[in-house]
Amino acid sequence: MASGKATGKTDAPAPVIKLGGPKPPKVGSSGNASWFQAIKANKLNIPPPKFEGSGVPDNENLKSSQQHGYWRRQATFKPGKGGRKPVPDAWYFYYTGTGPAANLNWGDSQDGIVWVAGKGADTKFRSNQGTRDSDKFDQYPLRFSDGGPDGNFRWDFIPLNGGRSGRSTAASSAASSRAPSREVSRGRRSGSEDDLIARAARIIQDQQKKGSRITKAKADEMAHRRYCKRTIPPNYKVDQVFGPRTKGKEGNFGDDKMNEEGIKDGRVTAMLNLVPSSHACLFGSRVTPKLQPDGLHLKFEFTTVVPRDDPQFDNYVKICDQCVDGVGTRPKDDEPRPKSRSSSRPATRGNSPAPRQQRPKKEKKPKKHDDEVDKALTSDEERNNAQLEFYDEPKVINWGDAALGENEL
């Protein structure tokens, strides 16, 4: 595991770090998005929101005099087969003097703007809080200590101890492997003659047959959550989730076969036996914190010891030889095999199937590509949509949780 990487360079000062939970940074940003997640209308054509309390999201970083701003409506559209399709409005909060309506004074009348202020707010003050760079910071979870919007609106619950994506995480895991020895001798239970990789592959197949399922949306969430919490969904390559494989630095585990097959490669499940749990990584590692311009980097150094008398010792060594700095290589036994005939007898009239009568093929109408549909959206609408999450019809994927570290071999 490796230390977090900066996602971009900026001249802005680094945000003040508080380890008690995520909070909007005290400094401005070069982005143009709201610091907070949106409230979403439950259906189309809903009137502007009304709030039980002040309507200002909780932000402990600001003084009470600075707690004022506006909610702005964003009409959003979703690409569809017949063109763009309207979806219920989203409303985003900005502090006075920031965001798309930065030129307005508090209380100025404008369609799609709802002004709000907390108790003791000085509405003549124009905020220097700025707006969010969505490539560097997650949306901050909405909390209203004095009452939120009316029942026509909702917002997705985000726990305070983490964000949804890996773009803003400053702490990622880095681990090599040397630590208090874990029990890796469970292989003795089934006998040393049982091949480790074959058993790992069987675990995945058995779990998939049991019908454990996740939706397309869930698979996408697994692959794009905070970097240090990601897992590889089915039908994803390793580099789609954790970036390209490298040599001699972070991200150096996995050969080309493992990268292509992802969790279908039995070697993945086998090696997850040696990967520390979250608690083991935290309390059994050498933890090194380091403040960087983009945030706090945490490095975890952990060692797992496989005893030489372990029945699967040779298999673990073999996998490491193949996969450590393995980019650009494949296992020697992973050669494509020619397809063989089901029978060694030559095909004759007596044993050959009769040719089927060929039906004329129907001409298929060309499908409308997504990029053609996307052209129906303006640049402003595409930017608005980028801040929202759409809920597509679930595409069911058969999935087993064996490769997520829950099963020991």
From Swiss-Prot:
Residues crossing the lipid bilayer are none
Under Gene Ontology molecular function, one entry of this record is: RNA binding
Which subcellular locations apply to this protein?
Virion; Host endoplasmic reticulum-Golgi intermediate compartment; Host Golgi apparatus
Asked if the Swiss-Prot or TrEMBL record annotates the protein with the keyword Oxidoreductase, the reply is: no
Modification sites for Phosphoserine: S190, S192, S379
| This protein's record includes keyword Transport | no
Q: Which residue intervals define the domain CoV N NTD in the entry? A: 31-156
Give the matching Pfam families: CoV_nucleocap
User: What S-S linkages are listed for this chain?
Assistant: C320-C323
Q: Where is the composition biased (Low complexity)?
A: 15-31, 166-179
Q: Where is the CoV N CTD domain?
A: 215-331
Chain residue ranges for the region called Disordered: 1-32, 46-68, 164-196, 238-258, 326-409
Keyword field = ADP-ribosylation, Disulfide bond, Host Golgi apparatus, Phosphoprotein, Ribonucleoprotein, RNA-binding, Transcription, Transcription regulation, Viral nucleoprotein, Virion
Compositionally biased residues, Basic and acidic residues: 180-192, 247-258, 368-384
List where Basic residues composition bias occurs. Answer: 358-367
- Which residues in this protein are found as Phosphothreonine? T378
For the region Dimerization, give the residue spans. Answer: 226-333
Segment RNA-binding: which positions?
Answer: 29-160
Q: What's one GO-annotated cellular component?
A: host cell Golgi apparatus
Free-text function comment from the UniProt entry? Packages the positive strand viral genome RNA into a helical ribonucleocapsid (RNP) and plays a fundamental role during virion assembly through its interactions with the viral genome and membrane protein M. Plays an important role in enhancing the efficiency of subgenomic viral RNA transcription as well as viral replication.
Q: Which family does it belong to?
A: Belongs to the gammacoronavirus nucleocapsid protein family.
How is the subunit organization of this protein annotated in UniProt?
Answer: Homooligomer. Both monomeric and oligomeric forms interact with RNA. Interacts with protein M. Interacts with NSP3; this interaction serves to tether the genome to the newly translated replicase-transcriptase complex at a very early stage of infection.
List the protein's name. Answer: Nucleoprotein
